[in-house]
């Protein structure tokens, strides 16, 4: 009976170590994919030709409430 318990304990230890080994690369791959996606979105946001058409409408409305004219300049709203 004691031998069976020792064998079961060793089997459980081997299985748990294999699970830990498999989990680390998976988590690392998910983190890498998330950081790549974040960097792509950040790069797109830095390009004003993609963001200004969306922001310009909000900027014009914002500046119109201030009775000024608004322009989108590098993703910033400039009221003049």
From Swiss-Prot:
Which residues does the UniProt site feature Important for both antimicrobial and insecticidal activities point to? 42
Record's GO cellular component terms = extracellular region
GO BP field: defense response to bacterium
Q: What is known of its domains?
A: Contains 2 domains: a N-terminal domain that is unstructured or forms an alpha-helix in presence of membranes and a CS-alpha/beta C-terminal domain, which consists of an alpha-helix disulfide-linked to antiparallel beta-sheets.
Superkingdom field: Eukaryota
Q: Where in the cell is it found?
A: Secreted
Residues the UniProt record annotates as site (Important for insecticidal activity, but not for antimicrobial activity): 74-75
Q: Which PROSITE patterns match?
A: BSPN_CSAB (PS51862)
Organs and tissues of expression = Expressed by the venom gland.
Q: What start and end residues bound the annotated signal peptide?
A: 1-21
Q: Disulphide bridges in this chain?
A: 52-72, 59-77, 63-79
Q: Domain BetaSPN-type CS-alpha/beta: where?
A: 49-80
Provide the alphabetized UniProt keywords: Antibiotic, Antimicrobial, Disulfide bond, Neurotoxin, Secreted, Signal, Toxin
State the name under which the record lists this protein.
Answer: Peptide LaIT2
List the Pfam families hit by this protein, alphabetically: Scorpion_toxin_alpha-beta
Which residues carry the site feature described as Important for antimicrobial activity, but not for insecticidal activity? 36
**Function summary:** Dual-function toxin that acts both as an insecticidal and an antimicrobial peptide. May inhibit voltage-gated potassium channels (Kv). This amphipathic peptide causes significant antimicrobial activity against E.coli (MIC=7 uM) but does not show any activity against S.aureus even at high concentration. In vivo, causes paralysis or death to crickets.
Family, similarity comment? Belongs to the long chain scorpion toxin family. Class 2 subfamily.
A single Gene Ontology MF term assigned here is: toxin activity
């Amino acid at each position: 009976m004691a031998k069976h318990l020792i064998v079961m304990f060793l089997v459980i230890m081997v299985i748990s170590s294999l699970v830990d080994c498999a989990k680390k690369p998976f988590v690392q791959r998910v983190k890498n994919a998330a950081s790549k996606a974040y960097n792509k979105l950040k790069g797109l946001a830095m390009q004003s030709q993609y963001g200004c058409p969306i922001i310009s409408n909000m900027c014009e409305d914002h500046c119109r409430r201030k009775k000024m004219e608004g322009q989108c300049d590098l993703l910033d709203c400039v009221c003049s």
